[in-house]
Each structure stands twice: as C-alpha cells, then as structure tokens.
Amino acid sequence: MKILVSACLLGENCKYSGGNNYNQAVCDFARGHQVVPVCPEVLGGLPTPRCPAEIVQGVVTNKEGINVDQEFRAGAAKALAIAKENGVELAILQSRSPSCGVKEIYDGTFSGTKIPGQGVFAKMLMDEGVRVLDAGELPKIILKNEDGKC
C-alpha cells in the first residue's frame, strides 16, 4: 500500500521550530509499505524554522499576525498533487497542525487551546476521498486491530 506521511513524523527536521515529530509507531506501521513523505508547509515555500501558525477565522496566520494562508494552501495543493501522482491510499498526518491536523487544531489564539477541526492539507485529502489518520491515534488503532475489535 502507498502511504503518505507527514515528513516530520519520519524524523525530517521540517517542523516550525526546526525540529521534528519523530514517531516510532508511524515508522513501524509504515514498514513494508511504500512511504511518500511530504511537508506541505515547506512545499508552500515556508522556511524551517518559521514562526508558529494557527488557523484564525478560516485564515492561516502566524503568531506575529502575518497572513500565511496562501503559502499553506499552495503547499497543501502541491502535497495533494504528489499524493495523487503516487496513488496514495492512506495518509498519516501530524496531530493539531494547521496543515495536517485531522480531528483537532489549535483555536487561533496561540494559547494551546484545541478545537475540533482539520488543517488545510488534511481537509483537502479528505475532500478527495483519501483515508486520513491522526498520528496520535495510530497506537490505539494498532491495538484495536491486534485485539480483533476494529
């Protein structure tokens, strides 16, 4: 199976802080599959490191109040094209990201408060019918499958 994965989850230093969100469970799950790593934010031309951003009233804005929506949406569109070109069947994305958040994102106040919602790229994938998983929920999903309760 072809699996698209947020590049930061695989250890690529593309996170806004300059680091990564390496996730062993994601790497273990992806082993034996064709992995397509992407970082929509980098694809959109944003530097690493960069100012943190959140979705504020539907627009991606960084902590300094600068509108970075165009960069986020352009990067998401490029990442979506990569997913389509590769025939991706599943995406595993970084939790709470304004690009990749699957079930919840930060509320736009830069206070750490989470709300239900999707990041720009996650929503694009879902709208295209790609199955999307939140990396933070992957261990629970694996356990359910092992217990035969899925």
Tell what function each PLM region has.
Residues M1-L4:
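Extreme N-terminal starter segment of soluble prokaryotic enzymes
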Residues L43, P52-I55, V59-K78, I82, ...:
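Divalent-metal-activated hydrolytic enzyme cores
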Residues G45-L46, P98-G101, K140:
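Short, active-site-adjacent cap segments at secondary-structure transitions
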Residues K78-T109:
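N-terminal glycine-rich phosphate/adenylate-binding segment common to multiple enzyme folds
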Residues C8, Q94-S97, E137:
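Short, well-ordered beta-to-alpha junction loops that form the rim of enzyme active sites
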Residues Y22-V35, G75-L90:
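Short amphipathic alpha-helices and their capping/turn segments at secondary-structure boundaries
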Residues G11-G18:
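Short N-terminal binding/cap micro-motifs at the start of the first secondary-structure element
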Residues N21-N62:
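Short, surface-exposed acidic-centric catalytic microdomains
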